[in-house]
A protein has these predicted regions:
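Internal/C-terminal transmembrane anchor helices
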Residues: 156-178
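Extended interaction regions within the primary functional domain
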Residues: 70-74, 80, 127-128, 141-142, ...
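Membrane-proximal soluble regions of multi-pass membrane proteins
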Residues: 20-33, 108-155
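Transmembrane-helix bundle segments that line or gate the permeation/cavity pathway
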Residues: 1-118
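Acidic, Ser/Thr-rich low-complexity segments on the non-lumenal side of membrane proteins
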Residues: 48-60, 134-135, 140-141, 208-220
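Conserved beta-hairpin
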Residues: 24, 28-31, 100, 179-211, ...
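Non-transmembrane, membrane-adjacent beta-strand/coil modules in membrane-associated proteins
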Residues: 119-132, 201-265
């Protein structure tokens, strides 16, 4: 529950910032990223596009902020964390969809009226992406919203975008990777040749070997004693690494904590 409360608070703040930023539609003489003649902004068709843009921006931001409440009802598991992460990043991206629509619609209106395209519009794609090989700046002021955006033609701009893309991709892929680890069975197998030993596996990966002649005692626990992770992974169905266990001290584990536990000495 605490995780969901923190995520909902962060989501509400970030979506609110998105909304307040994207409300600023007139930047450097360009309306929603498109430069129009001086009196064109007052035309009914232009005002209709602007009003539709602002209306859909409000609707999407409200739905994204309110949608997080529904995630409180998901069971407390790795799945809920994954859904929250994907929903969070999706909610930050969705408010930009009205920007793409409004920019393209205004461009078509400009072309239909025969208004010339301003030279400053050429480097901008959909009013959001800036690509100007002759501009040495790594970042420039946004045309829709507040803040700056990277120059995708500059080396520093490309590096900044690449770092952000890699970081976001790593975050989005962490959940599925942990999900695979959590649902891959951990097991012990008895190996009799060439030596008699117990081998611990997680899926097809062998984690450690216990020679049979080194086992002096076997104890069965109906449930796993209270333990704290020192290093490693502690998922819902998979623990691997070093743990401190009540009455047993430091132990090395590779097991399903929900299964019956056999402690070997």
């Amino acid at each position: 529950m605490a995780f969901s409360i923190i995520m909902l608070a962060c989501l509400t703040v970030c979506v609110g910032i998105d909304y307040l930023s994207l409300k600023h539609i007139d930047q450097n003489g360009a309306l929603l990223g498109v430069t129009l003649p001086p009196d064109a902004a007052a035309l009914p068709e232009v005002q209709s596009i602007v009003q539709q843009y602002l209306r859909w921006l409000r609707i999407i931001c409200l739905l994204c902020a309110a949608g997080g409440v529904g995630l409180f009802f998901l069971p407390d598991s790795l799945l809920r964390v994954m859904v929250w992460v994907y929903f969070f990043f999706g909610s930050l991206a969705l408010p930009y969809l009205p920007c793409l629509w409004a920019n393209r619609t205004l461009q078509r209106l400009r072309d239909a009226h025969g208004w010339p395209a301003a030279p400053g519009d050429v480097p901008w794609k959909y009013g959001l992406f800036y690509y100007a090989p002759d501009d040495t700046r790594a970042s420039v002021p946004k045309r829709i919203g507040k803040g700056t955006t990277a120059n995708l033609a500059a080396l520093r701009g490309k590096l900044a975008v690449a770092v952000n893309v890699i970081a976001i991709a790593a975050i989005l892929l962490t959940g599925p990777v942990l999900g695979v680890l959590d649902h891959t069975p951990a097991r012990l197998e008895l190996q009799v040749s060439p030596t008699v030993e117990l081998q611990s596996y997680h899926g097809k990966t062998r984690k450690y070997i216990i020679p049979l002649d080194s086992i002096t005692k076997v104890q069965v626990y109906p449930s796993l004693p209270e333990a704290g992770r020192v290093g490693g992974i502690d998922l819902e169905h998979y623990w691997q690494g070093t743990f401190v266990m009540v009455h047993d001290g430091t132990v090395h584990l590779c097991l399903d904590p929900t299964a019956q536990v056999r402690r070997m000495h």
